[in-house]
Amino acid sequence: MKAAVYERFQGPIALVDVADPLPASGDVVVEILAVGLCRSDYHGWHGTDPDIVCPHVGGHEFVGRVVAVGAGVTRWREGDRVVAPFVCGCGECGPCLLGQHQVCRRQQQPGFTRWGAFAQYTTVPFADTNAVAVPESVSDEAAALVGCRVSTSYRGVIERGRLRAGEVLCVFGCGGVGLAAVAMGRAVGATVVAVDIAPDALALAASVGSDITLDARDHDDIAAAVHAATGGAHVSVDCLGNAATAANSVFSLRALGRHVQIGLFPSALAEFPVSRVIRDELEVLGVHGLSASRFHEVFALMESGRLDPTAMVTQRLALSDVPSALPAMGRFASPGVSVVTSL
């Protein structure tokens, strides 16, 4: 098969012929139908993920058709169209037995702990736990984005953030997961504020559902601007991941609000406005993806017409574009989401 392989971090990515994967016990092999380019893939190539061992194939946000089934798999047959979460749970540990596969103690992550979907084929581990059937009405392009950005934003905004109709949601960072968070807010009937420093990203946020867009460069105090416009957010999400955006997210909340942290910080330790958390009895909530057992809720939103992930897509690529497109993500050259649809 063809795969986009890098031999070292920050090194060249080459489209080369490698052996087709074989299904281990419990796994299925899928032929990739579409795969998203996510900033996490860029960070992996850049060398910031300790789980990656070179040579490596990234790509963790995909939809595929089952072409081979490993021993012990009972739920899947060749020809089934499936997605999988980027965190694949073992199905047997304590968190998995509670249905919280996204914090599995033995988790596998295609594109990180094992080769991923920037290839013509990949494997889904623990397939009876992690593979999810895609409804016929959902396109390959839309389904691929459910594996990471859309499901992660659902977990953050709907499940962890508990956003309700009529509340105010503030989203810091309008990249892929931020745009998905904006769309989630619109889907549940919230007032959505989008914050970024790129006008084209803010324009795209408006097109997918934000009611208010704020360019942080235009405000000395962006949190004060959020309060002036809305009275303060009930839920605020840091989708970028640094001390400034996290602090601004917290300061944008009204009393008893919920801060959701999705973006990863550059370092493990960072300053954080704990005094405000204590004073206003705020909640601080982490997000590490969505359990496969909850994907049906996301698909239900899509089938109802309330959520359309393809509205975020601005580039459709071929697998042969990955060697140049992945390193280019570091330049933040274009807004929206890129999806490989030709393999």
Question: Predicted regions: what is each one?
Answer:
Residues 1, 247-250, 292-343:
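C-terminal hydrophobic helical "lid"/dimerization subdomain
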